[in-house]
Amino acid sequence: MANVIVIGAQWGDEGKGKITDLLSRSADVVVRPQGGVNAGHTIVVQGQTFKLHLIPSGILYPETECIIGSGTVIDPKVLLEELGQLKSLNVATDNLFISQTAHITMPYHRLFDQASEQRRGEKKIGTTGRGIGPTYADKSERTGIRVVDLMNPDELQEKLEWTINYKNVILEKLYNLDPLDPKVVIEEYINYADQLRPYVIDSSLKIYEAIQERKNILFEGAQGTLLDLDHGTYPYVTSSNPIAGGACVGSGIGPTVIDRVIGVAKAYTTRVGEGPFPTELHGDIGQQLCDRGAEFGTTTGRRRRCGWFDAVIGRYAVRVNGLDCLAITKLDVLDELAEIKVCTAYELDGQTCHHFPSNASEFARCTPIYETLPGWQQSTENCRSLEDLPKEALDYLKFLAELMEVSIAIVSLGASRDQTIIVEDPIHGPKRALLDENGDPVTTHE
């Protein structure tokens, strides 16, 4: 039995969908703990591409139960569209469950998100405009609509009549937008409720029962460590906690039941939207990474900013998540490069900096300190073991593992399931050793 968290170790879009899909074959339950339709994951199975935002990747395994947890924010319209897409492709969805305490994204959330971002002008954050931040804001202000409210038409009508009238004042007075018609919105969401009702459960209880039955549970994180509300590049972050601790909160379980945490990182670095990005490449190499890596967002279609691998933020991800091992994705994107750079530290105001600065303005002033490695300039897409890899590619992976001080358990060389090298058992492998001041293992946290 193992309860495993899969976490993005960069700014999201690391390939968590594929890694979760791979690991789901041995999972009894897959849980999506946080985030909303701002997160997208792409899975390719036998040449067929599935693009999902809310539904866990494990849905493609008919025997795997999939849970949308209480820490998520759900846009019912998008969720029903995903369910329809899966059903049209003959993918069973009766193994999907939705937490009754997850919050609901409403039309006014989307309007607030888009209008607020527009008013920021040059100081925009770079949100997806899908209403995620305003939904989480209402959750914190205790004025949000939850799934359990959606299931009670009378209670929903009472809450929404008051809430929409209140939100209309903001729409009209602050943003100069047309008000919403409460009757139309209520009718729309009651219709959504009728369609989603069969899926709604007490998710925390179901997860607890699965733990008691010693089932294998996989927690699928959304976004990435550097987008965490508390530990990311604030204010250029998401509105939830994509780190490992957030998976426990968003699932309704305690941290002591987690056996292992797997971090997912690209062999280079990408970022969507605004915010500091020390290793960003603006020239031909950056464009080459974008083109070869098909770096366009699943949710928005926006071009992702591309740069060299940043081991400083990588080590930070290891620290704040307690990563036990790594999955490195898109190694094949680097196949054509004559040389590859890795950021090992920053220069900040004339000083060498080995740690991620919490202040965004300081982070923006960081200049990467690089170490240059030779490229391999041959295809790795058909490699299925470490022995198949060119020596330079293997050396590159070893260098990343040394810098991150954590082992690499999985190497992904393409979008398909079979384009993968399993280096060590990512689920039942050893826990990461605690190191003394000399870098030697002193104990393990069993």
Curated annotation (Swiss-Prot):
CDD domains in the cross-refs: AdSS
Chief place of localization: cytoplasm
Cofactors: Mg(2+)
Cellular-component GO terms for this entry: cytoplasm
Any matching Pfam family: Adenylsucc_synt
Subcellular location: Cytoplasm
SUPFAM superfamilies hit by this protein: P-loop containing nucleoside triphosphate hydrolases
InterPro entries recorded: Adenylosuccin_syn_GTP-bd, Adenylosuccin_syn_Lys_AS, Adenylosuccinate_synth_dom1, Adenylosuccinate_synth_dom2, Adenylosuccinate_synth_dom3, Adenylosuccinate_synthetase, P-loop_NTPase
Record text on cofactor binding: Binds 1 Mg(2+) ion per subunit.
Amino-acid positions noted as binding substrate in the UniProt annotation, renumbered to this chain: 298-304
EC identifiers of the protein: 6.3.4.4
Record: active site: 13 (proton acceptor), 41 (proton donor)
Superkingdom of the source species: Bacteria
Positions that bind GTP: 12-18, 40-42, 304, 330-332, 412-414
Pathway connected to this protein: Purine metabolism; AMP biosynthesis via de novo pathway; AMP from IMP: step 1/2
Reaction(s) the record says it catalyses: IMP + L-aspartate + GTP = N(6)-(1,2-dicarboxyethyl)-AMP + GDP + phosphate + 2 H(+)
Keyword list, A-Z: Cytoplasm, GTP-binding, Ligase, Magnesium, Metal-binding, Nucleotide-binding, Purine biosynthesis
Gene Ontology molecular function: adenylosuccinate synthase activity; GTP binding; magnesium ion binding
HAMAP family referenced in this protein's UniProt entry, alphabetically: Adenylosucc_synth
Quaternary context: Homodimer.
Family named by the database record: Belongs to the adenylosuccinate synthetase family.
The protein, known as: Adenylosuccinate synthetase
Organism per entry: Crocosphaera subtropica (strain ATCC 51142 / BH68)
